[in-house]
Regions:
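Metal-dependent amide/peptide-bond hydrolase catalytic core
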Residues: 1-181, 187
Length: 190
């Protein structure tokens, strides 16, 4: 997407490592723990999260079911749906429990300028980059109402913290100093 390309161009500028679409890992490895997070914005993703079938260990089930968490890039919904059905085959029925949109918004305007100013006031060396979130966000619902929203989480995390590796985990956390920094930035923004 345009947002992801702008992000990667900025990372190239910061690291001196060119982005090669044929070998994205070369640049992604420069990002450390966030490489998995950013890598998910380069492609549609699917992760099987549940499998269930049968009622007893020694009985072959007549049917089974599974759940797959699918995230797609903007305007890729139909392609992904068709590809999943192709991969699953004709004997598998796919049911959608929940579907959201892929969302991309322009990284410009008074709100973005205010976020950059608030962050720069607390950390003059901060580099603000556009980013497209592949996960769920209220901004997807707000966009249906004509409201453009932005995620803004100014935490100033220590480089050694694998923050993205803790998402939705039993030990998800951030340092208190990161929250204090973020609070100061948000007060400036508001």
């Amino acid at each position: 997407t345009k947002t992801t390309r702008a992000f990667l161009d900025e990372v190239t500028e910061l690291t001196g490592v060119e982005f090669d679409p044929q070998n994205p890992q070369r640049l992604l490895k420069e990002l450390g723990a966030v490489s998995r997070f950013v890598g998910a914005t380069l492609q549609n993703t699917s992760n099987p999260t549940r499998l269930d079938g049968g009622y007893k260990t020694n009985v072959i089930p007549g049917s089974a079911q599974g759940s797959v968490d699918v995230r797609f890039l903007p305007e890729q919904e139909e392609y992904v749906r068709a590809k999943l059905q192709e991969l699953a085959g004709d004997r598998v029925r796919i049911e959608t429990e929940f579907e959201d949109i892929g969302l991309e918004v322009p990284f410009s305007g008074t709100v973005v300028d205010a976020m950059v100013d608030a962050l720069s006031a607390e950390d003059p060396d901060a580099v603000v980059l556009p980013y497209m979130l592949g996960a769920g966000t209220d901004n997807k619902s707000l966009s249906r109402l004509g409201i453009t929203g932005y995620g803004f989480v100014p935490l100033q995390l220590p480089p050694e913290l694998d923050f993205t590796g803790m998402f939705h985990g039993v030990d998800e956390r951030v340092p208190v100093s990161s929250l204090e920094f973020g609070s100061r930035v948000l007060v400036r923004l508001l």
